[in-house]
């Protein structure tokens, strides 16, 4: 009788442990093909202190959480960049959905902001932050924004 009860207990424990293994779950992971995007600059213009950029968001535009427009002044001082030097962004403008200057319509993104000295040349790039923190930011190439023409 005791052997029979031990056999039932062992069987129940084995079934319990086996049943737990069936429900093993993994943490969800981002599907790179569905959740990744790239940014491509289509057009940019400067007017005085302001810059307007039009970009294409290629891929999962719905995952674009925010953008950083990273920039540096071009000049001869030690805290300034130069054409041909490695790009070291010294300042950045953060824009998010709902902010003035951030307009996302489908896969078209328009950014507007006014922080520039109209007489200085700048180098800049745009970094798009993905809503899924496991995926890296998407960045454009580095571009030059010439000083505004005299008015």
Regions found by a protein language model. Give the residues of each.
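Bacterial N-terminal signal peptides that target proteins for export
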Residues: 1-8
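C-terminal motif of bacterial Sec signal peptides marking the signal peptidase cleavage site
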Residues: 16-19
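Pro/Thr/Ser/Gly-rich low-complexity, intrinsically disordered linker/stalk tracts
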Residues: 21-63, 136-151
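Solvent-exposed loop and beta-edge segments used for protein-protein assembly and interaction
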Residues: 45-49, 105, 116-120
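An aromatic-rich alpha-helical recognition segment common to small helix-rich domains
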Residues: 55, 69, 124-126
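Short coil/turn motifs at secondary-structure junctions
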Residues: 60, 74-76, 129-133, 145
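Recognizes extended acidic, P/S/T-rich segments that occur
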Residues: 65-117, 138
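Beta-strand-rich modules
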Residues: 112-136
């Amino acid at each position: 009788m005791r052997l029979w009860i031990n056999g039932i207990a062992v069987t129940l424990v084995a079934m319990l442990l086996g049943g737990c293994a069936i429900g093993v779950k993994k943490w969800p992971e981002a599907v790179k093909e569905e959740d990744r995007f790239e940014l491509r600059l289509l057009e940019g213009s400067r007017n005085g202190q302001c810059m307007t950029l039009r970009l294409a968001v290629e891929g999962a535009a719905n995952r674009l959480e925010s953008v950083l427009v990273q920039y540096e002044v071009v000049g001869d001082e030690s805290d300034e960049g130069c054409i041909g030097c490695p790009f070291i962004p010294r300042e950045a403008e953060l824009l998010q959905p709902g902010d003035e200057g951030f307009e996302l319509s489908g896969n078209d993104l328009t950014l507007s902001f006014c922080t520039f000295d109209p007489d200085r040349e700048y180098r800049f790039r745009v970094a798009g932050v993905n809503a899924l923190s496991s995926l890296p930011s998407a960045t454009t190439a580095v571009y030059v924004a010439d000083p505004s023409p005299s008015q």
